[in-house]
Amino acid sequence: MLSLHQLQFKNLFDLNITFLPSSITYIKGANGCGKSSLLRMIAGIMQPSSGHIYYRNCNINNIAKLYCTYIGHNLGLKSEMTVFENLKFWSEIYNSAATVYAAIHYFKLHDLLDKKCYSLSSGMQKIVAIARLIACQSDLWLLDEVETNLSKENRALLNNLIVMKANSGGIVLLSSHLESSIKSAQILRID
């Protein structure tokens, strides 16, 4: 369970909301309304102006940041490392090295494993970053505009992965300007 209590940020929003396990929520709103900031606060990267964020009844300021996997505008890839090295790096942080090959297989990355990430197109870099969702075992996914610039096939793979995460008890929060294609998703408007 993820709970936001009187969460405020620069007069952009004031939230009291709880996200239950097995939920998918799209965060919608105009540009500059605080969607990315909200996700960064939940990830523990930014601090709110006031209020508290609890994950499994613990204040996120008091727990290790491994409770979530956050993918934002900065994809978190090491450009000089190969695709395989990047996935292995992240999976080892989360103590889930065995999941690297599942990520490679799911996104069909076999032919790219030895390529340096800087040599990939921006769309393929994003897929490698998204593959971290499989390689890093966390129950809370925070995805900031990850659907942007994905091919139709890769967007379908991502949506399927999101639904599988929710079906296994995970919580997924996404910001997106695109129309939600996941019918079971809730919409949170913060504009």
UniProtKB/Swiss-Prot annotation:
Keywords on record: ATP-binding, Cell inner membrane, Cell membrane, Cytochrome c-type biogenesis, Membrane, Nucleotide-binding, Translocase, Transport
A molecular-function term among this protein's GO annotations: ABC-type heme transporter activity
Disulfide-bonded cysteines: none
Protein name: Cytochrome c biogenesis ATP-binding export protein CcmA
EC number: 7.6.2.5
Species annotation: Rickettsia conorii (strain ATCC VR-613 / Malish 7)
Protein's job: Part of the ABC transporter complex CcmAB involved in the biogenesis of c-type cytochromes; once thought to export heme, this seems not to be the case, but its exact role is uncertain. Responsible for energy coupling to the transport system.
Membrane topology field: Peripheral membrane protein
Subunit structure: The complex is composed of two ATP-binding proteins (CcmA) and two transmembrane proteins (CcmB).
Residues holding ATP: G29, A30, N31, G32, C33, G34, K35, S36
